[in-house]
Swiss-Prot record:
Active site, UniProt feature: 193 (schiff-base intermediate with substrate)
Keyword line: Lyase, Mitochondrion, Schiff base, Transit peptide
Regulation: Inhibited by divalent cations.
Main EC class the enzyme belongs to: lyase
Biological process according to GO: glyoxylate catabolic process
Name used for this protein in its record: 4-hydroxy-2-oxoglutarate aldolase, mitochondrial
Subcellular location: Mitochondrion
Amino acid sequence: MFAHRSFSLLCRRSAVTSWRSQSHTAGKRLDISGIYPPIATPFTEPEDVDYQKLDDNIRKYGRLPFRGLVVQGSNGEYPYLTAEERVEVVKRVKQALPKDKLVMAGSGCESTRATIQMSQRMADAGADCVLVVTPCFYRGRMDSRALINHYSKVADSCSVPVVLYSVPANTGLDLPVDAVIQLSKHPNIVGLKDSGGDITRIALMVQKTRSQDFQVLAGSAGFLMAAYAVGAVGGVCALANVLGQQVCELAQLCVSGRWDEAKELQYRLIEPNTAVTRGFGVPALKLAMDWFGYHGGICRSPLQPLSKADLEALRGKFSSNGWL
């Protein structure tokens, strides 16, 4: 049986009594364990941000046992939003979300300077921590030295804790393990969201950072059980936008050591999860949200709606696993 950290609550914050030893104004140790949906951004037909529908979604998510929400992650279509829109969305989410839930705001930009500025704007907008994706346009030069320098400068400057974000499917770049190990020692870097799905890599990072106050989150519901088994403490899962209660249930089963039950539920989540992530992407996630009573709707161009064939394939992934 894998060694596993015990937690007292399903997806909610555990009591935090220690202080992180650091010189930064962020100061306080932040426990990020639990489940987070990386929320979508609703748009009107002219492709303006629909803040009323956003508020409706947040109020529904607020009733589920999430640890918090990730705002302006990949599923929020942040590359297609202006800087002002990104910040305003975070403000609206913070206002609508229950106070006991975290707002983890995506603040990554291509330059270190812009990332520092956006991170502070997100903190000022109410974010409890920032999620910083790897800069990737010049990915051939983004070696460990460059990335350690980038994240260290961001964390040095930010007034809230920083969470590293590795999403190679979108960036073409895996945050190197040696860089993660080095960055885990920074007093204002509290964890990592890893969306690559390499469980050996996740296990190695958990093992190598155990002496630090550092937490690893799975970046997908598709490998959530496996990530928990090797020491991850939660997940940022696109599928939780649609099947939030079920993803939280899977987390609870893992935390409780009920691995046989967890395995059966994990099986039923794999195909729907793949469909709304690598299979058909954000347009599929938003369509599935519509099916399950949330506001998904259209994407901002150039993302296009699913074809009829893809729509039927998406429906099949949910129905064949008993969700529709």
